[in-house]
């Protein structure tokens, strides 16, 4: 992209006890600096809602170490990185023969079959059911024998060959050949009670961030799976109103463990799929949790195959400051799995919880005798440590006052990782490689490729890491490039969004400022979306866009076209975000500051940030607002209920209001248990309802979906009740049958239109 990005340097303002150091900031408003002479259109609310200006992605799926699949004009093409050419893998006309609208596809690892997904029906955040057909690529025809049942919950190819494992009605089945009958692996599945090979609600949302609980061994011989038992888990119930012709609303019931309630139990099994027989039932071998876990409630939180016959399991206590990794080997003579205590690796936290959200996954060397893992070092920063399976101690191979975000690939010579080391900016992401024979030899592969445009990268490696796709997300327009890891040479630009860049030349775009303030000798980063032709001598209304949950990050170098773009471009509102105590990727001291005390420091810091912004000279301190969604809705409500006098108004969407109402895994990670012996007092002292009286001083808009399975409508209902009880005049909006995302087309347009009207009224804008 050839956009003449500008750099804003200099001090925008000064504040008492605050140091402001300005870093390079990409300005998106191109052209004249004279607002009166700029006749270009602004980025409007309609532009956001209708997605007028679309960011182009480049999605690929690696199928070998040098080939990937991608879609173009609805054809599936295969690109050969070695020769630099593309060919048609499957024509769009082929899909027309199926008689169904194909939602997704998946190629078997041996390239012989393609799995076609249709009749997609969403369930929760990750889960869904669908129908599947298998297409034989050699015979160029659908397989009609022994088809996978409709309403299948999950399906996955083995890593090699073309075995299939799938879950239907909460039970697991395996196909050795796509056209042959399935082997049934489990017989205990029961809706909302026993889940085999798939997660229940809380494991899906808070532990695995996935619906699948199946793990193939690398050669496809063994299939590991988890079983979750929700028999004793309490149900959340809510009405689903559906079509207006429905005389009685449906009642949705979901096993949902709230803080302190009965949790699901978990068991883990492995089955040998090479020994399946149509005569006898499959034999699944259980691997039990370590004795240190069995003494109380615990979670299975990670499963990783080390070799064909070695598997690692990570277990976590319900109080999530203690985890154990078991490394288990297959004993062919007995058919059992042996997990030696001598190979257990314990991870603990004395200041908070283990991991960012859960313990990180291990990355094993080829022989399975050692692995690399991200853990906190003595200084409280998350870095890569090298473990040998028979030794307790590990060797850190990275260090510094920055953090490794993730390990991306491991070869015999190098380890590749993403970190935020570059220029000391926590909101940046770059790709590095470290030489395994000499840990002092570290190379940043992305830092200097296009530093003005690209400071936030993610990566996708080919099967053996010979090639990789770099995905730049900002601060400029997204850029996708292909590289060879042999010499780290850039091979080609896959997508540069040049068409969008040309369109945006004709739009008055806002600018983005990324900076930090120093409070109590600690850096806290913030970002500001500034109106076009920003003039620091003028006064602007300011909207604080907040999330502020544990390990969150709002101040980053990502390019976005969103609601804030409209507010800044068209309404001349500054939209700011601030990462205070509790935020992530800056060390445990900051992140663990809110351990066992949600609703305190992260709330206070948003108020203090607004105070400091108002001292910068260009903020109208009589027109400061705050808004947030989910945890951000909670913080917004706690801020407005603080009686600080800083904010005129605010919007809370789907907020938590009392932590005893939220799920056990998330809440207890940060708060412990709501018992007198543990942390009940703070549970009770951190509610929005206890601050109801102070809402008389502000304008408040409360929004929630009635079918929110995550943060239940109950949470907003209790806020509403408390405000009514003390006579607070406030606004409220509910969205019928909408879940936590309020994402249906009509609801999405309505909520952002409604919030825009509220903010404009609050700021006295026309």
UniProtKB/Swiss-Prot annotation:
Transmembrane region(s): 7-28
EC number: 3.4.14.5
Gene3D superfamilies xref list: alpha/beta hydrolase (3.40.50.1820), Dipeptidylpeptidase IV, N-terminal domain (2.140.10.30)
Keywords (A to Z) from UniProt: Aminopeptidase, Cell adhesion, Cell junction, Cell membrane, Cell projection, Disulfide bond, Glycoprotein, Host-virus interaction, Hydrolase, Membrane, Protease, Receptor, Secreted, Serine protease, Signal-anchor, Transmembrane, Transmembrane helix
Recorded topology in the membrane: Single-pass type II membrane protein
GO BP terms, alphabetized: behavioral fear response; cell adhesion; endothelial cell migration; glucagon processing; locomotory exploration behavior; membrane fusion; negative regulation of extracellular matrix disassembly; negative regulation of neutrophil chemotaxis
Family matches, as SUPFAM superfamilies: alpha/beta-Hydrolases, DPP6 N-terminal domain-like
Catalytic reaction(s) noted: Release of an N-terminal dipeptide, Xaa-Yaa-|-Zaa-, from a polypeptide, preferentially when Yaa is Pro, provided Zaa is neither Pro nor hydroxyproline
Catalytic site positions: 630, 708, 740
Tissue-specificity statement: Expressed specifically in lymphatic vessels but not in blood vessels in the skin, small intestine, esophagus, ovary, breast and prostate glands. Not detected in lymphatic vessels in the lung, kidney, uterus, liver and stomach (at protein level). Expressed in the poorly differentiated crypt cells of the small intestine as well as in the mature villous cells. Expressed at very low levels in the colon.
Result after altering residue 281 to A: Does not inhibit dipeptidyl peptidase activity, interaction with ADA and homodimer formation
Pfam families: DPPIV_N, Peptidase_S9
Mutagenesis or variant effect for residue 205 to K: Inhibits dipeptidyl peptidase activity
Localization per Swiss-Prot or TrEMBL: Cell membrane; Apical cell membrane; Cell projection, Invadopodium membrane; Cell projection, Lamellipodium membrane
Primary location class: membrane
Phenotype for residue 520 to A: Does not inhibit dipeptidyl peptidase activity, interaction with ADA and homodimer formation
Record note on modification: The soluble form (Dipeptidyl peptidase 4 soluble form also named SDPP) derives from the membrane form (Dipeptidyl peptidase 4 membrane form also named MDPP) by proteolytic processing.
Outcome recorded upon mutating residue 92 to A: Does not inhibit dipeptidyl peptidase activity, interaction with ADA and homodimer formation
Glycosylated residues in this chain: 85, 92, 150, 219, 229, 281, 321, 520, 685
Similarity section: Belongs to the peptidase S9B family. DPPIV subfamily.
Function as written in the Swiss-Prot or TrEMBL entry: Cell surface glycoprotein receptor involved in the costimulatory signal essential for T-cell receptor (TCR)-mediated T-cell activation. Acts as a positive regulator of T-cell coactivation, by binding at least ADA, CAV1, IGF2R, and PTPRC. Its binding to CAV1 and CARD11 induces T-cell proliferation and NF-kappa-B activation in a T-cell receptor/CD3-dependent manner. Its interaction with ADA also regulates lymphocyte-epithelial cell adhesion. (Microbial infection) Acts as a receptor for human coronavirus MERS-CoV-2.
Note: Level of plasma concentrations of the soluble form (SDPP) can be managed as a colon carcinoma diagnostic and prognostic marker.
Protein name: Dipeptidyl peptidase 4
Organism the protein comes from: Homo sapiens
């Amino acid at each position: 992209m050839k956009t003449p990005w500008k750099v804003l340097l200099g001090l925008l303002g000064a504040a008492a006890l605050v140091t402001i150091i300005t870093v390079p900031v990409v300005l998106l408003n191109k052209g004249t600096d004279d607002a009166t002479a700029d006749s270009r259109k602004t980025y409007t609310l309609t532009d956001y809602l209708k997605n007028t200006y679309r960011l182009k992605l480049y999605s690929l799926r690696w199928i070998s170490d040098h080939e990937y699949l991608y879609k173009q004009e609805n054809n599936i093409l295969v690109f050969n990185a070695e020769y630099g050419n593309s060919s048609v893998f499957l024509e769009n006309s082929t899909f027309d023969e199926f008689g169904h609208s194909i939602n997704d596809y998946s190629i078997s690892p041996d390239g012989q079959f393609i799995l076609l997904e249709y009749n997609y029906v969403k369930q929760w955040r990750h889960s869904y059911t669908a129908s599947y057909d298998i297409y034989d690529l050699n015979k160029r025809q659908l397989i009609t024998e022994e088809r996978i049942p409709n309403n299948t919950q999950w399906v996955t190819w083995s890593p090699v060959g073309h075995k299939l494992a799938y879950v239907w009605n909460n039970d697991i089945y395996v196909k050795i050949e796509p056209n042959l009958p399935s082997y049934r692996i489990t017989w205990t599945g029961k809706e909302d009670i026993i889940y085999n090979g798939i997660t229940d609600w809380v494991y899906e949302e808070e532990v695995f961030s996935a619906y699948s609980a199946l793990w193939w061994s690398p050669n496809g011989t063994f299939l590991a799976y988890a079983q979750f038992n929700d028999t004793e888990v309490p149900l959340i119930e809510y009405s689903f109103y559906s079509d207006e012709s429905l005389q009685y609303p449906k009642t949705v019931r979901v096993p949902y463990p709230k803080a302190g309630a009965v949790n699901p139990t978990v068991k883990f099994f492995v089955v040998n799929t090479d020994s399946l027989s149509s005569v006898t039932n499959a034999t699944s071998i259980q691997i039990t949790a370590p004795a240190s876990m069995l003494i109380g409630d615990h979670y299975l939180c990670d499963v990783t195959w080390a070799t064909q016959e070695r598997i690692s399991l990570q277990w976590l206590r319900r109080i999530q400051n203690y985890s154990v990794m078991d490394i288990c080997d297959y004993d062919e003579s007995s058919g059992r799995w042996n997990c030696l205590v001598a190979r257990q690796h314990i991870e603990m936290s004395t200041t908070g919880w283990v991991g960012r959200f859960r313990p990180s996954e291990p990355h094993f060397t080829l022989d399975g005798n050692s692995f690399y893992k991200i853990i906190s070092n003595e200084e409280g920063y998350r870095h890569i440590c090298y473990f040998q399976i028979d030794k307790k101690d590990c060797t850190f191979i990275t260090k510094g006052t920055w953090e490794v975000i993730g390990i991306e690939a491991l070869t015999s010579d190098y380890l590749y990782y993403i970190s935020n080391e570059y220029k000391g900016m926590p909101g940046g992401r770059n790709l590095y490689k470290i030489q395994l024979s000499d840990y002092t030899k570290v190379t940043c592969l992305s830092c200097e490729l296009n530093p003005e445009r690209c400071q936030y990268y993610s990566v996708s490696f080919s099967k053996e890491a010979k090639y990789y796709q770099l995905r730049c997300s900002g601060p400029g327009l997204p850029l996708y490039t292909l590289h060879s890891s042999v010499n780290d040479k850039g091979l080609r630009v896959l997508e540069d969004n040049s068409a969008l860049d040309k369109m945006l030349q004709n739009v008055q775009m806002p600018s983005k400022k990324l900076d930090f303030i120093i409070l109590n000798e600690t850096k806290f980063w913030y970002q500001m979306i500034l109106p076009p032709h920003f003039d620091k001598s003028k006064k602007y209304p300011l909207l604080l866009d907040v999330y502020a949950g544990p390990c969150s990050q709002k101040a980053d170098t990502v390019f976005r076209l969103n609601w804030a773009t409209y507010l800044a471009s068209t309404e001349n509102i500054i939209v700011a975000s601030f990462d205070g105590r509790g935020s992530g990727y800056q060390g445990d001291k900051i992140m663990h500051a809110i351990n066992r005390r949600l609703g305190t420091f992260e709330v206070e810091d948003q108020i203090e940030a607004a105070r400091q912004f108002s001292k910068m000279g260009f903020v109208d301190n009589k027109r400061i607002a705050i808004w947030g969604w989910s945890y951000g809705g909670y913080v917004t409500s706690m801020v407005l209920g603080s009686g600080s006098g800083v904010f005129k108004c605010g919007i809370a969407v789907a907020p938590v209001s009392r932590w005893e109402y939220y799920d056990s895994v998330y809440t207890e990670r940060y708060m412990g248990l709501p018992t007198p012996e543990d942390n009940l007092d703070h549970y009770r002292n951190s509610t929005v309802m206890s601050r109801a009286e102070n809402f008389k001083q502000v304008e408040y808009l409360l929004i929630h979906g009635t079918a929110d399975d995550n943060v239940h409508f109950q949470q907003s209902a209790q806020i509403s009740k408390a405000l009514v009880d003390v006579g607070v005049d406030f606004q409220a909006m509910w969205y019928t049958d909408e879940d936590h995302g309020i994402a249906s087309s009509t609801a999405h347009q309505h909520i952002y239109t409604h919030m825009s009207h509220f903010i404009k009224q609050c700021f006295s804008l026309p």
